[in-house]
Amino acid sequence: MNENIESVKKYNLWFGNTIDCGFPRPLYTENVASYLGSKVVKVLTGQRRVGKSYILRQTAMHLVQQGISSNNIVFINRELTAFDFIENYKDLDNFIRLYREELKPEGRIYIFIDEVQDIDGWERVVNSLSQDYTEDYEIFITGSNSKMFSGELSSLLSGRYVEFHIFPLSYGEYASIHQLPVGRESYLTYMADGGYPELVHFQSSDVKRNYISGLKDTVLLKDIIRRYTIRDVRLLEDLFAYLVNNSSNLLSVTNITNFIKSKGRKTSYDTVSLYLGYIEEVYLAHRALRYNIKGKEILSGSCKYYMNDLSFKNYLYAGFGYGAG
C-alpha cells in the first residue's frame, strides 16, 4: 500500500474503521442530506471549532447507513499532520488518483475535504472533479474564511455549489446534549457557558477559559495574522477585545479609530477598517448594518457587531463592557 494512503487510513472508514462523529446535529445534517445525490458541491462554512468536521463525519456515516460502501468515501483534513503531504492542488489531485488505485471504489465517490483553504489552488481540483462527466464524484468541503468564494471559485462554480453556515451550539442543542429541561435556568447556564461544542467536555471554569483563550489565539494567528501578514498584531487583538466589549452597540469605523487614537496609539481609518474586515472574514464577529425602513435602503456608516459566541465575553473579558446584548 502506498505510504500516503497508509498514513491516513485511520482517519477514514476503510477496512472497517470507525470515526468519532460527536453529538448529533440534525439541524445541519438533515439540511445537507437533502442535497445528497446531486453533484453540486456542498460547502460548510463557519469559524474554527464550531463543529464542521463532525457534521462532515455524520454525513459520511449517514451515507454508510444508506448502503454506500465505506471504500467510496474519502476524508482529507489539512489540520492533521498525516495530510501534510497535500500542500497544493497537484498533491490533492495525485492523492485522489492514488486513493482510486489502492481502494478501487466502484460507483460514485464521496470526497470530504476539511479546511480546504489550507490547500493552495484547491479550487482547481474541486471545480474539475465537480464537472468531470467521465467519473462520478460528490464533493463536500469546509472552510473557515468567508472570502473563500470571493474570487475565481465563485465564477468557476457559479450555480454549482450550496453553502451551509455552521454556528456554535444553539440553546436547543446545548440543552439536549446536557439533558437539561428547557427553561430560564438552563438558558442562563447556556448564556454563561457559550456554545462551542468542545466546552461540553470541560467542568472547570479555568479549563474553559484556557480553551477559549487558545481558540481566540488560534483563529487570530492561523486565519488572520499568517494569512494576511498583519503588521500591527497588538492593534488586531485590541480591536477584537473592543468588539467583544461593545457587542450590539452602535459603532462606526470612525469612532473606533478615534477611540484607538485617544489612547495614544497610531493607526488610520483604513487600517482599522481592514482589520475589522479580517475579523468578520473568519467569523469571529458578524456585522449588522442599519436599515432605513422608510427609505428601504441600507444606511452607511454606523453598524452593530455581534460576536459569534458569548464565551469570548464571559471567559476573557467578563469584567469589562456591557452585558450580553
List where the protein language model places each region.
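Interdomain motor-coupling "hinge/lid" segment immediately C-terminal to the ATP-binding subdomain
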Residues: N2-K9, N17, S144-S146, S150-L250, ...
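Walker A (P-loop) phosphate-binding loop of P-loop NTPases
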Residues: R48-R49
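Short glycine-rich substrate-engagement loop in P-loop NTPases that contacts/grips substrate
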Residues: V74-G107
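Conserved catalytic/switch belt of AAA+ P-loop NTPases
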Residues: E123-I141, S154-S155
